[in-house]
Amino acid sequence: MILACDVGGTKTNVALLESRGGAFEIVRLETFQSREHDSLEEILAAFIGSGTLPLEAAGFGVAGPVIGGRAIITNLPWQIEALQLADRFRLPTVALLNDVEALAWAVDSLPDAEILTLQPGLSVVGNVAVVAAGTGLGVSALVRSAGITVSLASEGGHADFAARSNLEVDLLTFLRSRHGHVSVERVLSGPGLVSIHEFLRGSEGGDEPEWLVSGLRSGHPAAAIVRAAMNGSSQACARAVDLFLGIYGAEAGNWALRTLATGGVFLGGGIAAKLLVASSGASEAWRRRAIDLFLLGFLEKGRFRPMLERVPVRVILNDSAPLIGAARCAEIASAARR
């Protein structure tokens, strides 16, 4: 039995998984509101209870950088240490890793039913790039070399945003006036979509429907923008989503080139599901157009367009994939100790 956690600024998922023939089955899963707890240890104590569990290993995917066995969560006042968790809960092996790094470990375990293909490309064994846009932007990769596969830890979402057009240069100038340094995450995330909308509203003007104004003032403004774009009630929202999709595709293409991802690009995070799978109820025509805009940005790489045309592009549909990846990493770490 393996304990796995997906630790985020909003919620923390904790699960017990069993490994069966290379695949993982979730035996038990609980979700905790992260901000209602003072630490991960408090959540684990509530999950495990007063007894003990026959655990082979534990894997913790966390929303933040992991350095020297220690993680500081980006949007929580938590500090997590692998050795401390091992001692407190008597865990024989602990794998502490970034959440998107954990997501990358899950890629090889996902069946076809849990993946949506945007571009089939050519199926070859090679590096795999992972890009996950949600509350923030995370990137990772599965790197294959000399018969060995490893998942790459990265904070690439905080690298510089590179504008590709005059409109994006204006967006960059707008964001620089707010933030100084403009990372890709400032654009390619839920808050980034809101910023794009604010930029376009300021430059184009026009009235917004009252329900949208109310939605933008709520706790979920990005979701309100997506809804308005899908139902055609706001030109500014539609333009914001169009611009966002092109930038998303461009960054996925950049990461594919940086990692030589001949094995494919996998998209995670809630935004890919909302915009490219159209889980919010958009028409098939809207979804097809969204995919076309994404792929236009993805493929627009000059001399390397032919290479990117051969790269499969897929969306991860399984919300539990980060848990599966954390469990897989923990299992590998446990086997290495034997």
Tell me the role of every PLM-derived stretch.
Residues 20-22, 111, 145-148:
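Short, surface-exposed beta-strand-loop junctions and turns on beta-sheet-rich folds
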Residues 49-96, 101-114, 130, 264, ...:
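Short beta-strand-loop/turn "lid" adjacent to the catalytic site in phosphate-handling enzymes
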Residues 115-120, 124-185, 276, 286-308:
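Glycine-rich phosphate-binding loop of actin/hexokinase-like ATP-binding domains
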